[in-house]
């Protein structure tokens, strides 16, 4: 029987025990990680690594878009923004454009920060203290 890497086991446990809000936060953080890795790959002229990381970021943006609750009015605006970010990531991949990546990184950071604040507010309301997400 193979021994599992403790870090991998910890990550898996974090995903398995996370709330839906925490999972969304993990997706935003993962997207930011892959965008940054893709930008580094462009700077290092590593097109294979750039492509791999941008595809991962694109997949995360698609997942975030697919999981929107379409019964909420704000979802239409968020969906349009996710579509725009996805298209910009595709264009950045084709054109090797770090400026486009920086643009999308800014949007994802804004979404992530707002989401993190919402999680903290919800925890504070529920538990009477502001836990860190």
UniProtKB/Swiss-Prot annotation:
What are its GO biological-process terms? bacterial-type flagellum assembly; bacterial-type flagellum-dependent cell motility
Q: Assign the protein's first listed, main location to one coarse class.
A: cytoplasm
Query: Which terms are listed as keywords in the entry?
Result: Bacterial flagellum biogenesis, Chaperone, Cytoplasm
Task: Note the InterPro entries from the entry.
Answer: FliS, FliS_sf
Biological function? Essential for filament assembly. May act as a facilitator of flagellin (hag) secretion. Antagonizes translational repressor CsrA indirectly.
Q: Per its UniProt record, what NCBIfam families does this chain match?
A: fliS (TIGR00208)
Can you say what this protein is called?
Flagellar secretion chaperone FliS
């Amino acid at each position: 029987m193979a021994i599992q890497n403790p870090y991998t086991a910890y990550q898996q446990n974090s995903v398995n025990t996370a709330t839906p809000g925490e999972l969304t936060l993990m997706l935003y953080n993962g997207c930011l990680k892959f965008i940054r890795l893709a930008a580094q790959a462009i700077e290092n002229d590593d097109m294979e690594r750039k492509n791999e990381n941008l595809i991962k970021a694109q997949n995360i943006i698609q997942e975030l878009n697919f999981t929107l609750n379409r019964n909420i009015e704000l979802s239409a605006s968020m969906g349009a923004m996710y579509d725009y970010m996805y298209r910009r990531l595709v264009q950045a991949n084709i054109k090797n454009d770090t400026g486009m990546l920086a643009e999308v990184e800014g949007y994802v950071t804004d979404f992530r920060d707002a989401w993190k604040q919402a999680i903290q507010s919800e925890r504070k309301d529920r538990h009477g203290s502001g836990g860190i997400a």
